[in-house]
Structure formats: C-alpha cells, structure tokens
Amino acid sequence: MNAEIIAVGTELLLGQIANTNAQFLSEKLASIGINVYYHTVVGDNNKRLQQAIEVAEERADMLIFTGGLGPTKDDLTKETIASSLAEELVYDEKALASIGDYFKRTGREFTENNKKQALVLDGATVFANDHGMAPGMGLNKNGKVYILLPGPPKEMKPMYVSYVEPFLRNFTTGENIYSRVLRFFGIGESQLEVKVQDLIDGQTNPTIAPLANDGEVTLRLTAKHQNVDEAEKLIQHVEDLILERVGEFFYGYDQEFLHYKAIELLKKKGLTLACAESLTGGLFGNQVTESAGVSSVFKGGVICYHNDVKQHVLHVPEEVLSTDGAVSKECARYLAENVKELLKADIGISFTGVAGPDASEHKEPGTVFVGLAIKDEPTVVFPLNLSGSRQQIRERSAKYGFYHLYKKLEEI
C-alpha cells in the first residue's frame, strides 16, 4: 500500500515550525510495510487543500493528514475532506464529553467553536486524543484510506502509537520492514560508496542507502519480511560483507552517536578524561556532559582561547607559541599533556586550529591539530585539513576528537 502525507498549516509554509510529523510518520509507516512516496504541505486554504486531496487520490492508496483539526476558522481539514467525500460531520460523544470536562475543570466557558473539535467523519474509526482535545479518525471509502491526525507532535505521536498503527495494520500484507543503520567516520561518502558499489548496484532485499551528514556517513540496510528473524539474517549477511571492506571506519549502529560511544568506552575501561579547547571553545566538553553519569570519567576542561591561558595556565612554552605558533602540532601536544596533569586525569585531549573565515598565523581556515595524551602511551597529534563554515569546522574538529579518542581506547 502506498501513502501520501499531507501536512496542513500555513505556519509550515512560512517556515515558522518544522514538519517533524512527516519524518516520524514516514519512519513508522515504513516499519509496517506502507510506502510513503510523497510529502505535501498545504496552507490553511480550502481550495488549495481540495486540490491537494485530488492530486493525492490519483497517486496514493492512503492519505494521511496532520493538522487543521482545531477550533478556529482556519482549521479546515475535516470540513474539506467531508465535502470531498460527501460525508457528514457528526459529534463523537466521548470526545465531546472529554473536551467539556476539560473546560469544566479549568473554569472556562465551553464555546461552540471548541465543540467543533469533537466533530468526526460519519462512519469513521475514532482515535482518542489522550494528550489534547481533537480526536483523530480513519475512514476507508472508495478504495482509499483517509487518516486525520492532530498537528501538535505531542498529540499526534502518542495517538499514532496507541491507536493509529493498530488500525493501519488491517490494510497491510503482514510483510514488515526492518532497518539497521551502520555508522562510519573518517571516510567520505564517495570513498565508502566506491568500496561497496557492487553491493549497492546489486541490492534487492535488503536495500542499501548511503547518507552523508556532518562529517560522517551512514548506511541504512532495509529488509522486507514477514518474520523478524529472517529479516535480521538478510541484514546481517549484507552487513558482514560491508564490514569486511570498510570495517576500520565503522563505530556503531542506529542512534549510537560517536560521543556516546567514546564515553561508554571510558567508563568501561575506568579511565578519566580532561580537555583543553582553543579552537572548539567548549564544544567538546559540552558534548561530553550530554551523557548521564559522566562525572565518573570527566574531570573537566580548560577553554584556552587566548595565548596567555595556553602559556600561564597550561604551560605551553613561550618559545613554542612564538616559533611554532598556537596552531601547531607542538602546541597541541603540550596542551593535551598539560591539561592531563593539571586536572589529574588519565587522558588529555586538545584542540587548536583556525576556524576561519580568515587565515591565522599564515595558516588557512580548516587547519586543525587534535592532541591526545594517554597515560603510559606516547602522545599523538592528529593534523586535520577541514572545510566548511566556521561553525562546521569547530563541530567537525570536536567530532574528530571523539573519533580518535574512541579508536585509541579500542586499542588499549
């Protein structure tokens, strides 16, 4: 079955809010074997919404609407669909009572326009709104399935999970879709794709979808099967083939982000970390502290943006700063070693470089050095040559820091 998601709301077209509902629904629908081929966004306008419905009916078996179920005059979704299908709108008594109870509890007047939220298409299956007022609904008519959902994600998402997905399973073949995301760092999308090109060209089930995002590459493996164990076998076979070729760049699955993986390894090995940040200005430390319980492994950091701090707090020799410069391998080495000693940590990591947009110390933007000092190990400095905006260079530098930290921790 093929679906189209139609998001209704002028605020979406104006860019005032992001259409996160479509992303959520697409992922959920794919997991139960419903293909989403189109996303449509239309404003709060009866005529244009009617046109969107007519177009969607020509190319989709299922039309899923989000938004436009509220109490105001510009909430037109139910009325427009009712007119299009020649269906009446009737009050759902449970929804009407629930909305009335809310106004009674809050001491507010239950006005006619708020009663409008309890209207549903005659004959539709009603989805209770446990986190808001307007119920959702589903109607099978003329060989098409129409699903109407509230716009606020805090209402739509739990409604989908509790009521909509069980309803939609009545229209699926029983063949589910299972996905696994492989995460890679330290290799570009084009390089990775070349190494697995024959697998991509020959893909059937599972499929392989590469995606580059903010300095890393993911491969989404997607298999269709009625049985989850068989789907897992299909995915595992292709994963094994991929990792035989590019396993050195692989670091995790799905939502296992690089900084979380590095912190997990620190905890596992019982080692502590300190950071010295010039270029990144605290970005690395900020990401470290996103992990719960990180105080057991993170001693702290020094933001050493000015050379005075590098020299007088972290004891980078004046001759290094005047001869090699702050953006240098030698400076990165001293920063990593000395922050480790200063904060009595097992590991020190440092970041120094040129974020841009202008050159500094006759070095171009994107020139970066990441230092890594680990007890009982020789200090290593990783030179980087990055591209992008000032913020992208800073963020990618921090990510490379986590990557090199993770890889070194795997070795020891």
Curated annotation (Swiss-Prot):
* Top-level taxon in the UniProt lineage: Bacteria
The species this protein belongs to is Bacillus cereus (strain ZK / E33L)
The text of the family note is: Belongs to the CinA family.
SMART domains reported in the protein's UniProt record? MoCF_biosynth (SM00852)
Source organism phylogeny: Bacteria, Bacillati, Bacillota, Bacilli, Bacillales
SUPFAM superfamilies, per database record: CinA-like, Molybdenum cofactor biosynthesis proteins
Q: Which NCBIfam families match?
A: cinA_nterm, molyb_syn, PncC_domain, PRK00549.1
Official protein name in the record: Putative competence-damage inducible protein
Alphabetical list of Gene3D superfamilies matching this protein: 3.30.70.2860, CinA-like, MoaB/Mog-like domain
